[in-house]
């Protein structure tokens, strides 16, 4: 058997890469003698906001894969002759790997494996051959190890993205393709990536994404620090610890229509279970049905939704309470717009309107609606890094004005792929929250003075996540997150610090 070998210099020419990494205390107007109840029974409030997201990507018809088109000096050798020339094997293997020549790699791998091979090149060749032979799980596993070791090796990242697409790992595939777009690529390669994204967007398969977090809470009820005292009054709440699990499941399906339009259904389930403090257990469901338009650079989605929330009761519940009760119901509409300004810059905008109704009579003064607007600008200078800045506005209108407020915030973030397979993500945030009215009338005798003025809060947050890219088990990568929240206020009973540690296991099916 004769083999035509391309003789090229022993250099790696990167042309790709990137992974888009992509509470308020509710207080009562109570006027007890010296103990002022601090109502922390409501679960954490969440605010619609965009942040770097890893979008779902998959493919239908397969775009043409990149292969070598260069004309080089060629020689004809038999397998036996090639086996006696390790230098030629290496000079042939490297271009074959870089240029996605799966047939050439398949021929060269058995020869190279017997010649004191470089472990990295051997693993890369094994990944290519596994993909050619349809062993996609094995191929993806090997490619992830390769990228963890050399995150700037763009040809291998492209091959990983294609393997993920073929393996119908939609979210992961789209994330890798979006990373690759951030590089200064030749026009044909950008066209190739866009063709993959376009065909992936036309997939109509069900997507399931879920995960479990281990929670370690030192102040699950957002209470002021122990020993807080003001004007002779003390809060009724003290920080409580809790340990447990949070869980989430997202089920979604798209139906592609003509000219880039689509309809979409999704269902979200979220919950928290604390085995040593059950009164803070919670559970929620949200159903979304809508549609939109998308192409390789733009996605616009309008999604009406309904939501139900169950809660044991928090501080309003007895110590041994365990039963979840209907807490609130909501309905509204969400508009989500993503647009790539350039291959390196992306802007994401989310607008949401919600009508919320509380089930328990004593909570119905909180009935009302809310508006939120969130904008995030994302910059990806290369395949190993991203930066983002976000601006958020949230307005809550309630029957009782003392519960209504406006919140304005800013977020800054940075994600990085480091050598040795380590990845990190850091986000810092700052927000101001201003309530519409005081929680106590000025002529109320048994209330502290700070209840008689409009409450203003300053809210600070830090989130840091770290994981190892090559640590995978059944497609799951464990991640560790530390989250810190601090609120200062002109109401000392609304000030608190909160440290949380998460251990996250998530997977896309």
From Swiss-Prot:
TPR repeats lie at residues 120-153. GO terms for cellular component: cell outer membrane. Keywords: Cell outer membrane, Membrane, Signal, TPR repeat, Transmembrane, Transmembrane beta strand. Residues 205-509 are annotated as: C-terminal probable beta barrel. It comes from the Bacteria. Pfam families: SlipAM (PF04575), TPR_Slam (PF24575). It is a multi-pass membrane protein. The keyword Oxidoreductase does not apply. The chain crosses the membrane at residues 206-216, 245-256, 261-270, 284-294, 298-308, 331-341, 345-355, 371-381, 386-395, 408-417, 423-432, 461-470, 476-485, 499-509. Residues 33-204 are annotated as: N-terminal domain. Residues 1-32 form the signal peptide. Residues 46-57 have a biased composition (Polar residues). It is found in: Cell outer membrane. Residues 43-72 are annotated as: Disordered. Consists of a soluble N-terminal domain and C-terminal probable beta-barrel in the outer membrane with 14 predicted beta-strands. Belongs to the Slam family. Required for correct export to the cell surface of some cell outer membrane lipoproteins (tested with PM1514) upon heterologous expression in E.coli and probably also in Pasteurella. This is Surface lipoprotein assembly modifier. It comes from Pasteurella multocida (strain Pm70).
